[in-house]
Amino acid sequence: MPKIVDHDERRAEVLSAARRVIARDGLDAATTRAIAKEAGYSNGVLAHYFTDKDEILLSALRQSHQRIRERLARKVEGVTGLAALRELLLDNLPLDAERTQETRLEVSFWSRSLASERLADVQRSEAAELRAAVRDLLAQAKAAGELSTDQNLDDVTEHLLALVDGLSLHLLLYPDRLRRVDLERILLQHLDNLR
């Protein structure tokens, strides 16, 4: 009797393996051989599900973004304004092992995106979606009287996103200087200053 294979499950396993290799060893180390080994499959199995390495990498990035969106949707369900903004921004910081892996993955793709229009398009799309969500939550908070700032909300949005990116990068690069609790404290101070 032939073995029944769940193709979606196998693709997901390969993408999960790709994310682990990238987060642990970097994007350059994410060869098809390394990804196949991490997943426990042969290179031939990867070729059956993906046309090339770039498709695996791009799919791994998209899958990571989708997982983040799903997790965030659960966290902010029924929450609006400043409380939802707080959750959204904290969720984008590497405050636990899962989010640290996601941040390492994301940062690994940043430099590659400078040379790949295809990757850059994915990054721009995701950044625009996040930017719009932050801007909308700021507008909700302002309308609800939760913010006292007179600053342009587009500028506040850029400031908050730059803060999250900077704090995340600093934690990855200088773990001896910053702790996760420091990131949370600094971000929450900035949000409190908007009240």
Feature-to-residue mapping (PLM):
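Residues in soluble alpha-helical coiled-coils and helical-bundle/repeat scaffolds
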Residues: T51-E55, V76-T80, A97, Q101, ...
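Short, basic, alpha-helical segments at the C-terminal edge of helix-turn-helix-like DNA-binding modules
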Residues: R62-R67
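Conserved amphipathic alpha-helical interaction elements at protein-protein interfaces in regulatory
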Residues: R20, R24, D52, R74, ...
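Hydrophobic/aromatic-rich alpha-helical bundle segments in the mid-to-C-terminal region
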Residues: T100, R118-R124, A128, K142-L194
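Helix-turn-helix
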Residues: E13, A17-S59
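Hydrophobic alpha-helical connector segments
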Residues: S59, E70-T103, L153-L160
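Short secondary-structure transition hinges
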Residues: E87-D136
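N-terminal intrinsically disordered/low-complexity leader segments
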Residues: M1-E9, R20
